[in-house]
């Protein structure tokens, strides 16, 4: 009986360390990627960034085009009000003020809509890029033998051999040859029937 217990304890002692060893976490093999470089040097990213800059410049140009005549009209109305020296404005001047306020509100709404569209376009571009990057990270990690990838801006220091940015850029150029720079139209809320 004593021999049986000793044999069983020896078998258990031999089996338990191998079970614990199977639970061990593998050593980290880390790769780093510079996402700023990826998104600024991939071919379609450069094209999309130029299109966004053009949209933003168009918005700024439109803002100036709307502001100039409004400012001129506002000065003329203010001069007419000042000329009254505190008297009540006549119906024509009140009508002119109301028309000016309507134009001003319409211009603000137009600019807000364009600004919203530019922001939606930017988010849509970023989504297209990030949708492609997820699988690319996995592919590059497997190809380079890494089991962890970190953005280079989150590291204190790293060796050049850990940098896989060029691999990610090359894969992104292949996976995303072009980017749509106009977000699809937003779904309209359904109107309730009668």
PLM regions with names:
Residues 1, 10-12, 108:
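Domain-scale selection of a single, long terminal region
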Residues 1-8, 18:
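Bacterial N-terminal signal peptides that target proteins for export
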Residues 13-21:
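C-terminal segment of classical bacterial N-terminal signal peptides
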Residues 21-194:
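Amphipathic, charged alpha-helical segments and their helix-to-coil junctions
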């Amino acid at each position: 009986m004593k021999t049986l217990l000793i044999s069983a304890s020896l078998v258990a002692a031999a089996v338990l360390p191998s079970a614990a060893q199977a639970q061990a976490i593998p050593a980290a093999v880390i790769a780093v990627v510079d996402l700023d470089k990826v998104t600024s040097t991939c071919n379609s990213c450069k094209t999309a960034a130029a299109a966004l800059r053009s949209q933003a410049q168009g918005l700024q140009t439109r803002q100036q085009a709307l502001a100039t005549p409004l400012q001129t009209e506002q000065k003329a109305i203010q001069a007419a009000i000042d000329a009254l020296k505190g008297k009540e404005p006549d119906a024509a001047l009140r009508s002119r003020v109301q028309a000016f306020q309507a134009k001003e509100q319409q211009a603000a709404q137009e600019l807000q809509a364009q600004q919203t569209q530019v922001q939606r376009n930017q988010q849509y571009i970023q989504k297209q890029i990030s949708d492609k990057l997820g699988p690319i990270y996995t592919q590059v990690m497997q190809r380079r033998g890494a089991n962890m990838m970190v953005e280079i801006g989150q590291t204190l220091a790293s060796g050049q051999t850990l940098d896989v940015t060029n691999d990610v850029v090359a894969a992104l150029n292949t996976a995303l040859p072009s980017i749509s720079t106009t977000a699809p139209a937003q779904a309209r809320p359904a109107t309730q029937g009668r």
